[in-house]
């Protein structure tokens, strides 16, 4: 139901404002999360929430994406992520950080509203010993923590906030079967939209066929992890080729599936081939009217 509501709202916006859709939205920062301890992780998250609120332009809903690293099964009953300093945090630790991000956003709020998003990745899931069943539960518990965050936001009266989940899903990082289970687990829990802010590594740059991508993936697999169930594509567009690859994914989906594929926005970065604004414009130029006015940016 949340995905349907999101899709209907996006369709209304794109239909009502076809001219405005051609203008790149202002980029807002996303963060790779680090911390030597759970307390440090909470402190950084609070600061990021406050910074995001102070920088947020306009009155629309924007995505605050916090990427906690690679999804992991920590023990027989505990899931979480290993962060970018190779420190493992449980979902309880991550929820504590997400709540502090919500606090920071609320205390520094100026305008607009926010979707605070628990991000992780498919990096070396199988290499860490995780099975496809483990990956399903990782996605399930990620959505569950997003729902817990929403309960916290409601309990605090943070009426300008909501919450969701996300995955940096990249073909080169692990196989398509185990990666799909992250998306399936999220859908199984049922709360969170699952933004795919990953890549389409090695996929074709033209046509609409189910061509081969990196690591045994195909275009259809990228379509699945980005648009199946509660998944919403927020693709990594760092170079012009990426926009072309994702356009092939959209064309394949529209030709093979019953739904109309659209993009929830774009993930950009500093220090790459395209500026964040150019990244959004590159995808929009190939998919006119099908790219939402969202632009998250690592390094901004």
What are these regions (language model features)?
Residues 55-77:
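Extracytoplasmic cell-surface/polysaccharide-interacting catalytic and binding patches
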Residues 74-86, 127-136:
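Surface-exposed, active-site-proximal loop segments in enzymatic domains
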Residues 1-5:
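Positively charged n-region of N-terminal signal peptides that target proteins for export
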């Amino acid at each position: 139901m949340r995905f349907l509501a999101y899709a209907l709202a996006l369709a209304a916006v794109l239909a009502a404002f076809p001219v405005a859709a051609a203008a790149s939205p202002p980029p807002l920062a996303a963060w790779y999360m680090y911390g030597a301890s759970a307390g440090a992780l909470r402190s950084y998250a609070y600061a990021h929430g406050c910074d995001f609120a102070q920088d947020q332009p306009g009155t629309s809903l924007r995505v605050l994406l916090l990427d906690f690293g690679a999804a992991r099964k920590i023990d027989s009953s505990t899931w979480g992520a290993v962060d970018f300093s190779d420190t493992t945090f449980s979902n309880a630790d991550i929820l504590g950080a997400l709540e502090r991000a919500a606090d920071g956003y609320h205390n520094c709020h100026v305008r607009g509203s926010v979707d605070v998003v628990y991000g992780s990745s498919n990096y070396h899931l199988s290499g860490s010993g995780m099975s496809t069943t483990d990956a399903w539960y990782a996605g399930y518990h990620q959505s569950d923590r997003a729902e817990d965050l929403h309960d916290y936001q409601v309990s605090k009266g943070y009426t300008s906030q909501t919450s969701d989940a996300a995955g940096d899903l990249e073909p080169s990082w692990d196989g398509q079967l185990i990666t799909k289970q992250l998306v399936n687990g999220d859908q199984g829990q049922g709360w969170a939209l699952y933004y795919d802010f990953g890549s389409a590594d090695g996929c074709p740059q033209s046509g609409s066929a189910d061509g081969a991508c990196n690591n045994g993936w195909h275009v259809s697999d990228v379509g699945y992890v980005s648009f199946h169930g509660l998944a919403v594509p927020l693709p990594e567009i760092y170079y012009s080729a990426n926009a072309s690859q994702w356009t092939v994914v959209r064309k394949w989906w529209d030709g093979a599936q019953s739904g109309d594929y659209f993009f929830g926005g774009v993930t950009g970065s500093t220090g790459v081939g395209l500026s964040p604004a150019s990244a959004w414009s590159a995808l929009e130029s190939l998919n006119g009217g099908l790219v939402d006015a969202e632009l998250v940016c690592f390094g901004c």
